[in-house]
């Protein structure tokens, strides 16, 4: 049988899809492109925004149109959070939540015997571990991504992720160290640590991200350890001092802000003020000037006034960030913010997104100009294409050795 996969949303989903692909291949299935005719289509859904829901449904419709006789399986975060909504779609044959994603192949084979529509979703908050760590390794070319943690213990008022991914579960430190050593032996120079909320790594184990990093930097052969998104209130002084002083830790940090208005930050239950956020950003940039700081911003949060938005704009304009991801607010199931009123009209949200996207382009250009004339470490990710330690993607002739870490003049 032929099986095709479509992955929506974050890298967590990409990890999970790769795990599923391997299981299907081992069972003798032929994995084909989502654009091809297949007997089974697996859509790994996203629900972080209304747009994620919409894109997930569109993928489901596309699959059934491509082959009306195919079995369509909806899994992932949308399936976990709102399974009955997906089950109502005539195009969907199976709904499998994140709790049972690792058993999807077995559930599918049971379906093949009975051909009865089924919803298989468990209680996400009962999940106690990250499953199948040995295969939770995803590659973007020569850059391996390790999922070291899953879930989030912080229930921000706008965010559905804890309901989709559960509470914090961390991979044992020894397993991660072993995996990174294997990657070093294979010649990889950079490794990316990722998770739902990386700064919560180890909370369920009695240790933390600092502990993990102090072990990983000892591994010979790995020259760059890149970190995914972190929350500034989960970064203690030990961790901050380490990331600005240790050369092996890539000077590229994604620190979600969400709003530059203290009133909105409080409504979001983010746990910090813009002044506290600025203090962390300034500490990093002052102590490691080449650092790239990325962030996330939500516009149009319920009750956000023009004054709130202007505070956000002026704050982002002032602080030394290098790029931002901008999202229009959308109500999510189970969240406190979904009950907040008044809601902002779509046209206002779109306009605020547009304004911040213009600022984002200026920030990216400013960061590039700031780095001109500097010699930086960079990984050759494709022939004549490099990614610098501080996340500048550049094209330069004469670099043929893919996977090699070099020094390059910007």
Curated annotation (Swiss-Prot):
Annotated EC: 2.8.4.5
Pfam families for the chain: Radical_SAM, UPF0004
Binding site for [4Fe-4S] cluster 1: 10, 46, 77
Function: Catalyzes the methylthiolation of N6-threonylcarbamoyladenosine (t(6)A), leading to the formation of 2-methylthio-N6-threonylcarbamoyladenosine (ms(2)t(6)A) at position 37 in tRNAs that read codons beginning with adenine.
Domain of life: Bacteria
Family from the record: Belongs to the methylthiotransferase family. MtaB subfamily.
Molecular-function GO terms, alphabetical: 4 iron, 4 sulfur cluster binding; metal ion binding; N6-threonylcarbomyladenosine methylthiotransferase activity; tRNA (N(6)-L-threonylcarbamoyladenosine(37)-C(2))-methylthiotransferase
Species of provenance: Aquifex aeolicus (strain VF5)
Manner of cofactor binding, per the entry note: Binds 2 [4Fe-4S] clusters. One cluster is coordinated with 3 cysteines and an exchangeable S-adenosyl-L-methionine.
Name of the molecule in the record: Threonylcarbamoyladenosine tRNA methylthiotransferase MtaB
Catalyses which reaction(s): N(6)-L-threonylcarbamoyladenosine(37) in tRNA + (sulfur carrier)-SH + AH2 + 2 S-adenosyl-L-methionine = 2-methylsulfanyl-N(6)-L-threonylcarbamoyladenosine(37) in tRNA + (sulfur carrier)-H + 5'-deoxyadenosine + L-methionine + A + S-adenosyl-L-homocysteine + 2 H(+)
Main location: cytoplasm
Residues holding [4Fe-4S] cluster 2: 152, 156, 159
């Amino acid at each position: 049988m032929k099986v095709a996969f479509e992955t929506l949303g974050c890298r967590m989903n990409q990890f999970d899809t790769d795990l599923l692909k391997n299981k299907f291949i081992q069972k003798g299935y032929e994995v084909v492109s989502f654009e091809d005719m297949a007997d089974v289509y697996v859509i790994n859904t996203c629900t972080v925004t209304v747009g994620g829901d919409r894109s997930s449904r569109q993928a489901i419709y596309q699959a059934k149109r491509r082959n009306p006789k195919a079995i369509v399986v909806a899994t992932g975060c949308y399936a976990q959070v709102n399974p009955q909504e997906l089950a109502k779609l005539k195009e969907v044959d199976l709904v499998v939540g994140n709790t049972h994603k690792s058993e999807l192949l077995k559930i599918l084979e049971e379906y093949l015997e009975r051909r009865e529509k089924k919803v298989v979703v468990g209680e996400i908050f009962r999940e106690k571990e990250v499953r199948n760590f040995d295969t939770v390794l995803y590659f973007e070319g020569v850059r391996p991504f390790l999922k070291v943690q899953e879930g989030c213990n912080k229930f921000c008022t706008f965010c559905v992720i804890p309901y989709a991914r559960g509470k914090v579960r961390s991979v044992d430190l020894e397993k991660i160290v072993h995996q990174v050593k294997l990657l070093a032996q294979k010649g990889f120079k950079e490794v990316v640590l990722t998770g739902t909320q990386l700064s919560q790594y180890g909370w369920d184990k009695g240790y933390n991200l600092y502990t993990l990093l102090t072990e990983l930097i000892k591994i010979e052969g790995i020259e760059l350890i890149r970190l995914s998104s972190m929350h500034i209130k989960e970064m203690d002084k030990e961790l901050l001092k380490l990331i600005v002083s240790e050369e092996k830790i890539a000077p590229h940090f994604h620190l979600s802000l969400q709003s530059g208005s203290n009133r909105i930050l409080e409504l979001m239950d983010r746990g910090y003020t813009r002044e506290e956020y600025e203090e962390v950003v300034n500490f990093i940039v002052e102590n490691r000037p080449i650092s790239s700081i990325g962030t996330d911003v939500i516009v149009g949060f319920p009750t956000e006034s023009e004054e709130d938005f202007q505070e956000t704009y002026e704050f982002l304009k002032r602080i030394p960030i290098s790029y931002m991801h901008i999202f229009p607010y959308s109500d999510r199931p189970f969240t406190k913010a979904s009950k907040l009123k008044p809601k902002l009209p779509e046209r206002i949200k779109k306009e605020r997104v547009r304004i911040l996207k213009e600022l984002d382009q200026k920030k990216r250009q400013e960061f590039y100009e700031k780095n001109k004339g500097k010699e930086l470490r960079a990984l050759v990710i494709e022939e004549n294409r490099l990614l610098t330690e501080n996340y500048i993607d550049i094209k330069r002739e004469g670099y043929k050795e893919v996977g090699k870490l070099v020094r390059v003049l910007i």
